[in-house]
Amino acid sequence: GLAAVYQIARDFGEAEILVGARSRDRLYFLDECRACSTVHVATDDGSEGFHGRVSELLRQRLEAMSPAERERLVFYNCGPEPMVHAAVAVQREFCRPERIFSAIDYLTKCGVGICGACAAPDGRRLCVDGPFLAEDAG
């Protein structure tokens, strides 16, 4: 998940990357991310950065911003389904859903949309409709 977010930050600039992992030894690619953006780290065990889940760090970061600052934000979420859903739930409290895009780490088998292994619950296929899917406003 982090590689896609890194590429967005590198190519478009002025980004903050929030990274979550169970522990410090599961964190990768941080130096590359820090070279192009501000990086905030959360670990479940507190071994690096914020002690807790990345969605809790996200909430803390958003609460510290003014409404005008939050209005300018666009979110790109990448990672396992539970983490992405937790992040989206927090983001929806602070911004409009059309500013939230997510790529959930689903298993992709065929890569061309035939097998449906990477289908999101609404039927969109990450391999052909993604990798980032816009959050549904409804």
Sequence positions of predicted segments:
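Functionally engaged cysteine thiol sites
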Residues: 78, 110, 127
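FNR/FR-type flavoprotein reductase catalytic core
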Residues: 1-107
